[in-house]
Amino acid sequence: MATVQKIYEEMQRMAPLELAESWDNPGLLVDCGGEVSRVLVALDVTAETLAEAEQNGCQLIVTHHPVIFHPLKKLSPADLPFQLVQKGISAICMHTNLDAAEGGVNEVLAGIFGMKNWKPFAGGCGRVGEVEPITVPELARKARVELGARCNTPLDGPEVPVKYADTGKPVRRLAVISGAGGGLFEEALAMEADCLLTEIGRAHV
């Protein structure tokens, strides 16, 4: 049977920790050891995902965002790492190393949008490349459909889950970066991108 350590070693082969940004904290962050028969995969470790893992008999939670990000100065029963140990559930978190990895988050995004001849940017996390000419509104619609953004909201409804600014020019060269990429606008421009697609932008750029 698989163990926490064996699963972690396989994940490191796919997304080596050396690819992570210096400020990040990916890895096997809560190690309760032992064998693993069931795994819960989620974006974050939350009270809800922890409860779901426990209800489904999972010995391991794998997330994108680290459950321990800043150095711990104290630990209490209200803290999620404490609760994980208490319940005997380990946590592996793969963040910017998975963003930057070959076949990782941003290469998947590049594939979704049909990117060709891509190059890395944003320290290797993002991707910039050529796409078939598309308008910005069409690109926003494609993002909503392909990424399932608020899939229960009508695409032309009053609530717009994908925000965009439109220069009116077609997008032929696209930059993609998962997470908070609003600060990479100038770098995307320097790489001749017509559009930057990211999870979190900025109000003023």
Model-assigned labels for residue ranges:
Residues 1-204:
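Hydrophobic structural segments
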